[in-house]
Amino acid sequence: MILLQAYEGLVPTLHSIIELCGKYRLRRSRDSSVCGWCIIRKDCFARRAWLNQPKSRKPKPPSSSLDLHNFCQATHEIFLLFSQELHQNSVIALVNFLHSSFESRKHDIAYTGKAIAIDFSSTSFPP
């Protein structure tokens, strides 16, 4: 109906737009072309079948084995690693090592404390 009005030179009315696509224009984006690592997305009208699909029943599998987002994060980490000075990297590594060793010692102490308490209570009473 809108195409017919455009062909005849008429302006589409609100009634004809509502009749064609409902009260609201529902849009979604889709991949139109892939150029290297870049995916060009473009808006299009959402189909009723796509809107009625429950998304929880059909999980979307990962797009590829090498996810673009993870690849970019790894690249940024490599660049940041070399951009910092050497003493900053060594300080960060030292802090991480101390933090992890302190956490493991804290768990060992708690476990040893429980074992000593159980052993002390069992041997302190006369038979």
From Swiss-Prot:
Keywords: Mitochondrion. It is found in: Mitochondrion. It comes from the Eukaryota. GO terms for cellular component: mitochondrion. A stretch of 270 kb of the mitochondrial genome is duplicated within the centromere of chromosome 2 resulting in the duplication of the gene. The expression of the duplicated gene (At2g07737) is not demonstrated. This is Uncharacterized mitochondrial protein AtMg00320.
